[in-house]
Amino acid sequence: MILHQHFPSLVPIMKRYPYAIQRADLIRYVLLYLYGGVYLDLDYVCLRNLAPLLDSLPPGCAVGLVPSNNSQGHVTNSVLVSHPRAEFWLYVIRATMQNKPWWAVTKHLLVFSTTGPFMLNRVLSDYPYPFKIHIFPNAVVPCNTCNLTRCKATGSESFLLPVVGKSWHSWDSTMFDWMYCHSTLLLVAMVFFMLCAMTHKSK
């Protein structure tokens, strides 16, 4: 009903999405634009009142984003803070209308590139008014996917503790998580096999 009233052009796009998580992503951006507030995924435990996150946005900043502890230099779309009618979300909503990239051949890549973090970071890098976006410190969500069961959020700046969720993830999500958490091992293995190949070729 909200889409029909405020963004009717999004209705056919939402219907074409193959996965429910894509529709959930789009709706969160629309609601943040219309009403503002604090959005977070269900797989978080609140450690304290979240109102200070919204109150701490610097003057002139309408949107607050949280760094992804899984990807250096990127933000996550699982925790979003905004005042109502922040223009940034219109850029994000428009980006969800674009065609999927050619390389988005698995569910994880498709979701991330069309409505998820890849798309959000692409919009953020192209946004012409970066001074209107506040990036919170990593300590707001101090854990990553590799240490969920061991992480202890004890810092004074920690607001949220992620827990194991991943309700929409599929086999490729599990694979990418494993590769990320074992990147050092993979790098060592690649170097080892390259050296073996070079040694074999020189004989």
Regions found by a protein language model. Name each.
Residues 1-24, 40-203:
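Glycosyltransferase-associated regions of secretory-pathway enzymes
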Residues 25-37:
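Small-residue hinge/turn detector
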